Amino acid sequence: MSFGRSNHVHRGILMETEIRFKIRHRETFADGESFGNTGQYERIAGEIRFAVDPDSDAYSMVVDLKHAPRNDHGFVEFATDFYILKPADLAQGNRRLLYDVNNRGALRMLQFFNDAVHSNTPSTTEHAGNGFLMRRGYSLVWSGWQGDIMPGDGRQTMRLPIATENGEEITGVTRSEFIVDEHGVLSMPLSANGYTSSYEAISTDTRDATFTMREYESDQRQPIADDDWAFARLQNGRPIPSAFHCHLPRGFKPGWIYELVYTAKNPNVQGLGLTGVRDLISFLLHDEADTEGTPNPLRLNGTRMEKAYGWGRSQSGRFLREFVYRGYNEDSQGRRVFDAISPHVSGGGRVVLNYRFAQPGRYPRPHD
């Protein structure tokens, strides 16, 4: 993708940030159903392309951003999916933006507020549920923030740059845990699940890694011999060498903790998930149009969003805590981003996001 620097004077976000909306779907929501005094809703989906100045103070906290590739204007590029449900007539809405921090790429807000059937691409009356948020007039927004989520099932994803140092690959020690729930599992992605990408091992030689197992967290780790496992995946029942998978021919014991420590390469700049949310919400609150003049979808004929609220369940609530605690609830002009946040059933933790080789989908459990 290519970006040009913009001099639009109407943009609220300064020259350190460029935003381009690529709208791919725009249509009436829920078969044109009318929701009380708010009326009909509109569905908008597509991609947002960002270009940010890595030398700006607004991005100084993003780990490895200075090691990311730059375009011809010195900006770092990345992109995210987005999804918006808004009143067809914004003037009939309540001028409130409600942002749902997706949970591992999944959209959860309508399930919990509207008693709706879950969908990552809500479009029907069934997906509107009881219509509660629509009758109240909210504009609903989703976007990607977790850079290791893989495409599929309508999940919200990001496309992040890979950091390098002086043109060379960055490597580092990383750790992965595997816990399976059933017998017969012989191979696992290094990320421990099928919807999260794995950091590539620099070598498939098992002597360069450490693989252990234990039944309980407090137990002593039992080494697994180098010859008893492989960096491999199964294809038609046969192991194929893979720097992204772990293969244990005797099978993983259900409930046991398997820990793999290995040297990985090519970390992506995960911290841009935090700035991407910040800059998107700031844009939707304050700007008339993006860098190329595409109108702000939540601003029309003098009607604009006056407040923004963030909601997240479990992992998503932990993201909101991290977002606030790290100082991202202030945009590049010192304005508040979210007026309120609601971390729902998220425990007391935060996400591990703005680190080299971050794995934001990981979370502590009593067993591991």
What are these regions (language model features)?
Residues 3-14:
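Short, Lys/Arg-enriched N-terminal segments with co-localized hydrophobic residues
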Residues 16-368:
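C-terminal His-loop and adjacent cap/lid subdomain of alpha/beta-hydrolase
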Residues 1-2, 48:
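A signal for specific C-terminal beta-sheet/loop modules enriched in small/flexible residues
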